[in-house]
């Protein structure tokens, strides 16, 4: 039987999860943030004027940061005790699965950006043949890239449902109010903020999943630190 990890170890895992969500969000913001918001998002026009440093920084920062989510989900696995093992393990495995897909999605965004930028150059030159070719390639790349998000969102939705059920039943070490800080509800909050206050919400909307997990892991880690006995 494996030894039970100390509260300090669990808290450290939470801090690493926060770091992953924060750095992943900064990387994704570098890739996706546009002052025009989601205008023309379906054609990837926001990629056209993206500075090379933002493309490189956003790409590498996000793909190297997202795997830190795995440690954050181990933190959650431990914090959900004494919920049933099957529920905690399901949440852990779904977290690993969803954010493996998320990293694959983020890793291929750079190629969409390059296609969008190349098409813009062809448009400036009036090269209709190249425009047609690049538009077709961009549409195909969009199909293969964007559909990965279905798995990410479905995984996080199931995680959130299981989490809420067991927290509200008092089957975990969390207080019941923590049920409100589930990832899906926080993602929805980011979109509501975008609709209500676009200048502020426009910063959080492109990184809604990362924003949700910064808040989620931060609240969980703060509770862990508060409950950690001195010297443990």
Where in the sequence are the language-model features?
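Hydrophobic, aromatic-enriched alpha-helical segments typical of multi-pass transmembrane helices
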Residues: 2-232
């Amino acid at each position: 039987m494996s030894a039970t990890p100390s509260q300090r170890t669990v808290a450290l895992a939470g801090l690493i999860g926060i770091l992953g969500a924060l750095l992943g969000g900064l990387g994704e913001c570098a890739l996706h943030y546009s002052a025009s918001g989601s205008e023309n998002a379906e054609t990837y026009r926001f990629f056209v004027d993206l500075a090379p440093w933002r493309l490189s920084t956003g790409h590498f920062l996000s793909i190297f940061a997202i795997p830190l989510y795995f440690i954050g989900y181990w933190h959650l696995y431990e914090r959900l005790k004494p919920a049933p093992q099957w529920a905690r393990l399901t949440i852990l495995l779904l977290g690993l699965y969803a954010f493996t897909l998320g990293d694959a999605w983020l890793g291929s965004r750079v190629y969409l950006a390059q296609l969008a930028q190349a098409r813009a150059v062809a448009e400036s030159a009036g090269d209709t043949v190249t425009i047609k070719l690049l538009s077709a390639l961009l549409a195909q790349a969009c199909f293969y890239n964007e559909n990965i998000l279905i798995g990410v969102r479905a995984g996080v939705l199931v995680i959130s449902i299981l989490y809420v059920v067991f927290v509200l039943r008092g089957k975990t070490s969390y207080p019941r109010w923590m049920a409100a800080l589930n990832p899906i509800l926080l993602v929805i909050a980011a979109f509501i903020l975008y609709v209500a206050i676009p200048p502020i919400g426009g910063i959080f909307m492109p990184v809604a999943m990362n924003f949700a997990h910064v808040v989620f892991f931060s609240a969980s880690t703060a509770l862990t630190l508060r409950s950690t006995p001195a010297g443990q």
